[in-house]
Amino acid sequence: MLAHPTLDKLNTMGLTGMAKAFSELISNGESEQLSHAEWLGLLLEREWSWRYDRKLAARLRFAKLRHQAVPEDVDYRSERGLDRALFMKLIGGDWIDAHDNLAICGPSGVGKSWLACALGHKACRDDRSVLYQRVPRLFANLALARGDGRYARLQRTLGHVQLLILDDWGLEPLNEQARHDLLEILEDRYGRRSTIITSQLPVSAWHEIIGNPTYADAILDRLVHNAHRIDLSGESLRRNQRRKS
């Protein structure tokens, strides 16, 4: 490694991005042609990029997104009824700033989870905290947390994350404890944070899945009242890919 007093100081101060850029610049003969302002600009840009990349990697690790999906890879040509104008607006993220929700509904295999994860990835890139949870596993984890003392901490995490993705909602009816847990989560989030929920069932069927009419009214009021809607249709994309292969 190149030895240089300035390089040592940059590393000591934890300016790793600057240190790497400095090492490259002084090893490059063309760097002598740069002005002091250009040198400083390059060093700052590399430090900013290095810190941004580290923060993004940490956010993605925390998010635990199911798919490595990004908005740039969304296929608007497939015949599934995806409104390009609406989705582009959602990519912008203003709805998250407004603490709105998003419901993505459609049959199995049309890309609901993938689209949700693409929006989650973009939110991470926009320096927002994101957490992905499959609903059946979430309720199981909450039950375990209630027994080992993690329940309050897990509820705080679910309530405070800026974008919560609840995937595979409505696969089975909710029991009494699940209804209570879900209402507590949504109560903490309503008007303060945004939630994406994906389901094979149309929103009109969610009341029945929740079961208890009082809970159903309270849950849906907090979940659907301020929700954008994406209703997908068509054949399973996974099935079509298997046919092509």
Curated annotation (Swiss-Prot):
It comes from the Bacteria. Pfam families: IstB_IS21. ATP binds at residues 106-113. GO terms for biological process: DNA replication. SMART domains: AAA. Transmembrane segments: none annotated. The keyword Nucleotide-binding applies. GO terms for molecular function: ATP binding; ATP hydrolysis activity. Keywords: ATP-binding, Nucleotide-binding, Plasmid, Transposable element. Belongs to the IS21/IS1162 putative ATP-binding protein family. PANTHER family: ATP-BINDING PROTEIN RV3427C IN INSERTION SEQUENCE-RELATED, CHROMOSOMAL REPLICATION INITIATOR PROTEIN DNAA. This is Putative insertion sequence ATP-binding protein y4pL. It comes from Sinorhizobium fredii (strain NBRC 101917 / NGR234).
